[in-house]
């Protein structure tokens, strides 16, 4: 297992508006990520200390994994261009006190930036029924993240500076669509989020008469799939370019065992989305 996830769902707020669906969202996304072979930690109705500890643990563990997913559902806001997720026990106060009482998502990205060669996906289904918009300096919705670390994708449930719908069923509208899209096999993450955006837009206009437009910022450098279904392969026949690529490195594999995957060739082969077998078997076929 080379994939790790931290899932947080905050619904039962003490001093700001309670939300119906984030706990359900977190339950469902955590369950799906487990099915997709992620090592999942799920935190429900978290206060600031809970959030800080779980994020710190997640970042420390990320060193041992290739891919990390952070999912948050609950209240969120921006102050002075920075994005914050809201703990369940927050008391509304002035701007400076609120900033130190919430978790700054920019800290998560800064912490992840020290891990080179990792893929980090942040999915933020927040900014619902925002209780902070009336306060001076508190803005509805999240702000754009500037210069995310290389290998990062940040997905918002709605456009910057806008609110998201909490949904008319057991999930927020965004997660309602996302949880099904994540299970579509062999769909690149960029195409998956495009699919989500179109469905969320269509449903929001139909149900609410107003468009919710999800958004992503990406610095990904490779292909990523949540769900991969290996395609049948004739081990005696493979793509000519891949064959030449592997043969040029044949000596590296002369002593390889059946369960060894080459760290250089495998991403190249997986990118074609059809050669999901050990490199050594391809070599033996030739």
Give each language-model segment a name.
Residues 1-286:
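Cysteine endopeptidase catalytic domains of the caspase/legumain-like
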